[in-house]
Amino acid sequence: MAYRSSTSRRSRGSVPTWVSIVIVAVLILAVGGLSWLAITRTQTPPPTEAPRVTPTMGVETPTATPTPTPTVTVAAAAGPAQRFLATSEGVWWRATAGQCGSIEPLLERSTDAGQTWSDVTPRYLGIGQILSLSPYAADQGQMVALMGADCTLQGMRTFTDGQFWEPNGDILASSTYIDPANPLAVVTPAGTLDAPCGAPTGVRAGDGTTAVICGSDASQSTDAATWSPLGQAGVLALTVSGDGQVTTARADAASCDGMLVAEPGAATCIPSIPTDAPVAVTLDGEGVPWVWAGDTFVSTR
């Protein structure tokens, strides 16, 4: 009887081996493809969205308001910056007041009409502040000043062209100045006057007339009792002549591009003279006004 191997006969309904291999390979490829697709989609960045423009609802940029130009108000120098100017027989004296205990005064003398000046401030006496300045005995000078560490009120006089000074009590009785102990009082040879304002400065006197500056206005007294306005605006300095007439140095931009010097019955414009610096004015022996303003020293004619 013939022998039949079991391997030579396949069971009915079984799938051939090669077909199984093909199916497995197809499945592997399908799974790999799906995995690659998933990874690719994960790594791809989302499309960039265009920025959205937010509409404005009537927003307007405010118009800048121009800053108004401040009005410049002129006023006479007061306190340490106050100036004094005096002359006699061709000798000139000038000074800045200073402030006793803090700002040193400066006193100078000239014999060549202000071309050169010599410092004659008596520092060796401890001068602290100058309150008035006037010529004496033709070519000498005198002043009312606060002296020493305690600011003692004294009259001072020189007989040596300003090299040496000595106290003199008669000067206090004959001088006009603002009382340092009471700035609202004007001391005169005829007595003490109440000032016409709260901050008087630039007081000068001559032949019974006393004149003082209040801000940029000026007043005068001829009876040692009452004051009357000069009726001039912008007064920076004044002086009183030997016959009691008042001359002023003024800032008046409407009529003068510089310093306007107003004498009784006449006015002279000195061009290019600063009106924003301390000023002093006086009359020489011929009655001609001289002005010391800033670094300028000049006559009107």
Where are these regions (language model features)?
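Hydrophobic single-pass membrane-targeting/anchoring helices
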Residues: 7-49
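Intrinsically disordered, low-complexity segments enriched in Gly and acidic/Ser/Thr residues
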Residues: 213-277
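Short glycine/acidic-enriched loop and turn motifs that connect beta-strands
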Residues: 92, 97-102, 147-151, 251-255, ...
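Blade-level signature of beta-propeller repeat domains, shared across WD40, Kelch, NHL, RCC1
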Residues: 282-301
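Conserved Ser/Thr-centered positions that define the repeating blades of beta-propeller domains
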Residues: 110-111, 156-159, 220-222, 260-264, ...
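Repeated scaffold domains used in trafficking and secretory/extracellular systems
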Residues: 77-86, 125-136, 169-181, 197-207, ...
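A short beta-strand motif characteristic of beta-propeller blades
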Residues: 70-75, 117-123, 164-168, 190-196, ...
